[in-house]
Regions:
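Short, structured surface patches at the beginning of a domain
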Residues: 1-97
Length: 97
């Protein structure tokens, strides 16, 4: 039987000031990853804004840099940042992997 390796997914959610919305976003992304036949190898949630208060984001980036993640599921890109330069930096780091 020729079995293909399933993509390894990381789920990330962050909606500052809205814990319920963050949890719902995480659940929706998890369901989509499973629907896409991914193995969810990890996930993180941040409850605050600001780069220094986001351990979940830093953990996600370490896993990506370490080659342990093939896909990232995020409900809205604004959960990464509302600033274009931060989004550019995020994608640049992903592409260097």
């Amino acid at each position: 039987m020729d079995e293909q390796k399933r993509p390894r997914a990381w789920v990330y959610a962050r909606i500052p000031g809205d814990y319920d919305g963050t949890i719902n976003s995480y659940k929706v992304c998890s369901m989509q990853a499973l629907h896409d036949s991914c193995d969810i190898v990890g996930g993180s949630i941040d409850e605050r804004g600001g780069w220094l208060l986001r351990p979940g984001y830093r953990d996600m980036m370490q896993q990506i840099k370490g080659g342990k993640v093939d896909r990232v599921y995020i409900c809205r890109m604004r959960q990464i940042s509302g600033k274009e330069r931060h989004l550019y930096s995020f994608f640049k780091r992903l592409m260097q992997r």
